[in-house]
Amino acid sequence: MASEKGPSNKDYTLRRRIEPWEFEVFFDPQELRKEACLLYEIKWGASSKTWRSSGKNTTNHVEVNFLEKLTSEGRLGPSTCCSITWFLSWSPCWECSMAIREFLSQHPGVTLIIFVARLFQHMDRRNRQGLKDLVTSGVTVRVMSVSEYCYCWENFVNYPPGKAAQWPRYPPRWMLMYALELYCIILGLPPCLKISRRHQKQLTFFSLTPQYCHYKMIPPYILLATGLLQPSVPWR
């Protein structure tokens, strides 16, 4: 049964939570909003406590803002161990990917997991290579699924009383299409996902244009989930 209360007043992250409308407009997979939003959590060493907050683009991309802020606070030394999880409305561009890799090379005790709602300009070869290089360097990059949307709603959003279980339900197919394209990027395959926009009605359309290499390299369970492969029906 859902709680009739909103986030507890004792929650130390309450003042840093974003509003429900912000979460909906920033993290909707079909909404191609230009601005980016970052929800993040940090676990320091063996501590059981998790520090959560959020950030948005300024004159710099939100990823760079985070790295600069964390470095300037003085808590992070070359031997400091911490685990960082990002929930990004857009995946990092190639320049941010380079900055992230440079940061991690200077702080080998830091681990980073990145969940993204959308892929930023995924047709750009530099952005594709940047994401691939992140994964190669040990960063976990994944597309947000239903469980991540639920988690973010409960832990980062100032939801109204009685709305703890009422996070936005976006069609899983959009998430699967982005996940398929991310898989293509990691494997070094050509783009498979095409996104088009009709500006008059502000409608976003997703389509898949697979090639032979996609069918050859991508696991069947992913192709089945996105409808690119039909399940076999046994003969009787």
From Swiss-Prot:
Co-factor note (free text): Binds 1 Zn(2+) ion per subunit.
The UniProt record lists the keyword Metal-binding: yes
Tissue: Expressed exclusively in the intestine.
Cofactor(s) this protein cannot do without: Zn(2+)
Entry EC no(s): 3.5.4.-, 3.5.4.36
Reaction it catalyzes: a cytidine in mRNA + H2O + H(+) = a uridine in mRNA + NH4(+); cytidine(6666) in apoB mRNA + H2O + H(+) = uridine(6666) in apoB mRNA + NH4(+)
Binding annotation for Zn(2+): 61, 93, 96
Active site (UniProt): 63 (proton donor)
Keywords from the named record: Cytoplasm, Hydrolase, Metal-binding, mRNA processing, Nucleus, Zinc
CDD domains: cytidine_deaminase
Major subcellular site: cytoplasm
GO MF annotation: an example: zinc ion binding
Key word Cytoplasm present: yes
Top-rank EC class of the record's enzyme: hydrolase
Domain CMP/dCMP-type deaminase stretches: 10-134
Superkingdom classification of source: Eukaryota
Effect of residue 96 to A: None or little editing activity
Biological process (GO), any one: mRNA processing
Location of this chain's protein in the cell: Cytoplasm; Nucleus
One Gene Ontology term, aspect cellular component: cytoplasm
Described purpose of this protein according to its UniProt entry: Cytidine deaminase catalyzing the cytidine to uridine postranscriptional editing of a variety of mRNAs. Form complexes with cofactors that confer differential editing activity and selectivity. Responsible for the postranscriptional editing of a CAA codon for Gln to a UAA codon for stop in the apolipoprotein B mRNA. Also involved in CGA (Arg) to UGA (Stop) editing in the NF1 mRNA. May also play a role in the epigenetic regulation of gene expression by participating in DNA demethylation.
Subunit structure: Homodimer. Interacts with A1CF; form an mRNA editing complex. Interacts with RBM47; form an mRNA editing complex. Found in a complex with CELF2/CUGBP2 and A1CF. Interacts with HNRPAB. Interacts with SYNCRIP.
Family as reported in the entry's similarity comment: Belongs to the cytidine and deoxycytidylate deaminase family.
Stored PANTHER family: C-U-EDITING ENZYME APOBEC-1, MRNA EDITING ENZYME
Name of the featured protein: C->U-editing enzyme APOBEC-1
UniProt organism field: Oryctolagus cuniculus
UniProt gene name: APOBEC1
